[in-house]
A protein has these predicted regions:
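Hydrophobic core of transmembrane alpha-helices in multi-pass small-molecule transporters
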Residues: 40, 109-110, 116, 122-143
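Helix-loop boundary and gating motifs at the non-cytosolic
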Residues: 12-89, 96-107, 111-114, 171
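Alpha-helical transmembrane segments of multi-pass membrane transport proteins
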Residues: 45-46, 77, 139-140, 152, ...
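Transmembrane alpha-helix termini and helix-breaking/packing motifs in multi-pass membrane transporters
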Residues: 51-59, 87-91, 114-121, 175-195
Length: 195
């Protein structure tokens, strides 16, 4: 092999490495943008649903004790189930699959929560809401360790603070806007216009 051929081969390998590095950087940038969008949509969901769940429970006939149970069970079970996700991660579970499945279930559980007054007898509605909201909290908290680990690997350390600052700012603004909009919509409904 001549010196020119060796030089050309070396240059081609370096070009290939550079192209692969650029492709990887593009993938990471795309993933980070998707994560910001995910944060915005999750905040919208929370602003619309989480903020008004106690009012929804009252509309379903919940007592003060039941409202306390609704929020306390969710706050108990949610973090407890993070421990089981840690065990799954230690056994080699895919962080991406764990997060995606839990997030999907977290969003889908809102459908039966909203359907409660239409499909269940009045005397069971609050109990069903408590169970479903506990599941909602479990699915919200369960992927936390996997998501944090995944994002820690994805976000370069030199831009981590700036990135999460931007993501949290956007999520906060979306939460405020959707909470206010949901409040305006709910204000329209009087007791005689519900269910």
């Amino acid at each position: 092999m001549t010196a020119t051929a060796e030089t050309k081969e070396r240059e081609e390998k370096e070009e290939t490495k550079q192209t692969q590095a650029e492709d990887e950087a593009t993938k990471i940038k795309k993933s980070l943008n998707y994560s910001i969008k995910d944060g915005a949509f999750a905040s919208a969901m929370g602003g619309i649903s989480d903020s008004y769940l106690p009012a929804y429970a009252v509309t379903l006939g919940a007592s003060n004790r039941q409202i306390g149970l609704l929020t306390s069970l969710a706050n108990l079970f949610g973090p407890l189930f993070q421990l089981s996700s840690l065990k799954m991660l230690r056994k080699g579970a895919s962080r991406k699959k764990l997060v995606l499945i839990a997030v999907l279930l977290h969003a889908l559980i809102l459908i039966p929560i909203l359907a409660i007054p239409f499909f269940f007898p009045e005397k069971y509605r609050v109990a069903i809401l408590i169970v479903l909201f506990s599941l909602y909290a479990i699915f919200a908290n369960f992927p936390g360790p996997a998501w944090a680990s995944w994002m820690g690997d994805l976000v370069p350390s030199k831009v981590r603070g700036e990135y999460f600052g931007r993501r949290n700012r956007i999520a906060g603004v979306v939460t405020i806007i959707t909470t206010l909009l949901a409040g305006l919509v709910l204000n329209y409904f009087t007791k005689d216009k519900v269910f």
